[in-house]
Amino acid sequence: MSSFPTVLVIGAGLAGSEAAWQIAQAGVPVRLIEMRPIKHSPAHYSSECAELVCSNSFGALSSDRAAGLLKEELRRLGSIVIRTADSHAVPAGGALAVNRASFSASLTKELSAHPHITIERQEQEHLPDEGQITVLATGPLTSELLAENLRTFTGRSECHFFDAASPIIEGESIDLTLAFRASRYDKGDADYMNCPMDKGQYLAFREALLNAEQAELKEFDKESAKFFEGCLPIEELARRGEDTMRYGPLKPIGLWDPRWGDLNDRDVRRSKRAYAVVQLRKEDLEGRLWNLVGFQTNLKWSEQKRVLKMIPGLHQAEFVRFGVMHRNTFSKPRSYLNQPCSSANDPTSSLLDRSPAQRDIPLQ
């Protein structure tokens, strides 16, 4: 029997799973509350802990980049999330990407086996009574009842934005006579699938995106729809200007198909280089599944099939998951949190962020 009071961690996403593990590793008992599969969010597909809803990439690996340095620090601090990600990594050039299914399944198994962690599958509808040491890590997809309770607790109105996920297709349906494998600037192995476009193909694709039907938002969301600027739907990028996509996720720089000729020949390079390139990243080691990088979208599923098949090499694409958009709830912590992230109303309650700096954050 532990002499420490039990800590309540609400939410078994990335932040909640890490918090529960670190607390338990210190010998403190933890109740980890997760509402799935009793109640699912609009974007989750499984009941596993730390399910990756959007990208399967954790960003740069190299420690000369800020994201890579942060991961190395977490590694040295014994992070279960980073350790599990390393164990389930898939080739992704200079990035740490994972097989999202085996990653979350493995992490769930470790959490379930920890002697100091009890996982309870139920919806937490309100904050616990004052005095209960609590970590709130429910993330941007916090259930409505708990979000309403938090608004009452903080005295702050709800803030929200819209986020989206990218489609995933079967690798065997990619036409390799048009697509090619390469990593940008030839860094590391040829881990990405690349679908090059000439100017005419790019402009036609953009026009199709602009005219495609989108999934309907609820009436109360239409007037206040805001997007997360770090993860904009591809159709929103298309709306922002003719060249926005090709200076963003479709940028062609650093990508060359050897079939085009000698990259060092200036005339060949000028005549053959792509106007834009769509990249796909592996979802598993075998390359059975690939996700379209930067292609989070709110298009209707039928429109996704029609428009995305215009991409050279994807004309026979078989979709295993379509892109979806969902409403994210976030908090403005500066107005009601002390350092480090404890509530001014109840110092025994804390909110966790996935990011290294405290700012306007999802409830995670």
Swiss-Prot record:
Tree of life domain: Bacteria
UniProt main location, coarse: cytoplasm
BP GO terms, sorted: tRNA methylation; tRNA wobble uridine modification
Pfam families, per database record: GIDA
Broad enzyme group: transferase
Cofactor dependency: FAD
Region spans: Disordered: 335-364
Biased composition, class Polar residues, residue ranges: 335-352
Binding site for FAD: G11, A12, G13, L14, A15, G16
Subcellular location: Cytoplasm
Gene Ontology cellular component annotations, sorted alphabetically: cytosol
Family: Belongs to the MnmG family. TrmFO subfamily.
Xref: HAMAP family: TrmFO
Function summary: Catalyzes the folate-dependent formation of 5-methyl-uridine at position 54 (M-5-U54) in all tRNAs.
Identification of the protein by name: Methylenetetrahydrofolate--tRNA-(uracil-5-)-methyltransferase TrmFO
Organism, scientific name: Prochlorococcus marinus (strain MIT 9313)
